Amino acid sequence: TAEEKEVLYTLFHLHEEVIDIKHRKKQRNKYSVRETWDKIVKDFNSHPHVSAMRNIKQIQKFWLNSRLRKQYPYRDGSSSNLSSGSAKISSVSVSVASAVPQQQQQQHHQQHDNVKEEPEYQISPDASEHNPQADTFDEIEMDANDVSEIDEDPMEQQQQQQQEAQAQAQAQAQVQSAAAEMQKMQQVNAVAVAAAAAANATMINTHQINVDQISAEKLTLNDLLHFKTARPREEIILQIKHPSEATATQIHTIPTQAQQHPMATITA
C-alpha cells in the first residue's frame, strides 16, 4: 500500500548512508549492514500502518526496484534530478510541438508542389539529453554490486547453520555413545549379578556335611539327597542310634551303589 511504501522510504532515508552503495561510508563492516537491514525489517513490521509482515528479502527487493525505477524520493540531489527531468520534458514537448506544424507543412507542399523538404531537428547542447539511459545503466551496475554484497550474508548464515548442525550431530553422537556405554555397563553388572546368584545357588545346593560331627537324627532327607563327600562310600560309617534302644549301637554301612530313597520321588 501507499502507507507501507512511505514507511519504507522513510526507513531507507534514515539508514541511507549504510545501505546505499553510492552514499555509504567506505570503511563499513558488512555485519553493520546486516544489522541495519534487520533493524529496518523490525521497525517496518512493528509499524502500526503495516498490514502484513515482510521479510528481509522482500524489503531488499523493494529497495532495489525503487532505486532502479527512480521511485525513491529521498535520494541526494533528487531536486536537481527532478528539475533536469522537468527541463527534459519541456524541451521534448517544445520539439514535438514544433515538429507537428513542420510535418503538416511538409505534407501540404507534397500535395501541391510535390516538393520534399527535410524536417529540421533541434540539437540540444546538453550531452546528457542524448543518452537519457546512462544514469539508468549506472544505477543498474552499482545496484548489481549492492546485490552481490547483500547475497554475502545468506552464505554466512548457511555456514553458521552447517556449523550448528555439525555441533548438534556431535552432541547427539556423544549422547548415544554414552548411552551405549551405560547399557554395556548395565549388561555387565547384570551378568555379574547373575553369576554371583548362580554361584550362591551352587554353594547352597552343594554344601558339605561332616558326618562325623552330626548325628543321623539331625539329618533330613534333603541333606541325604545332596550328600557329597570326597571319601569313598565304603569308608563312611554312620552310627545311628535307634530311639527305642538308646544304649544299643547299630552300625550301618552305606553301599557303593546309591539307593534311591522311597520318599525322594515324592519330595522331588
From Swiss-Prot:
Coiled coil location: none
Keyword set includes Nucleotidyltransferase: no
Keyword match Transcription regulation: yes
Signal peptide: none
Bias (Low complexity): 94-108
Alphabetized UniProt keyword annotations: DNA-binding, Nucleus, Transcription, Transcription regulation
Regions recorded as binding DNA: 1-72
Biased composition (Basic and acidic residues): 110-119
InterPro entries tied to this protein: Myb_DNA-bind_5
Taxonomy, superkingdom: Eukaryota
One Pfam family, short name: Myb_DNA-bind_5
Subcellular location, principal: nucleus
GO cellular component entries: nucleus
Localization of this protein: Nucleus
Sequence segments annotated as region (Disordered): 94-133
GO MF annotation list: DNA binding
Function in brief: Involved in transvection phenomena (= synapsis-dependent gene expression), where the synaptic pairing of chromosomes carrying genes with which zeste interacts influences the expression of these genes. Zeste binds to DNA and stimulates transcription from a nearby promoter.
Subunit structure: Self-associates forming complexes of several hundred monomers.
Protein name in UniProt: Regulatory protein zeste
Native species: Drosophila simulans (Fruit fly)
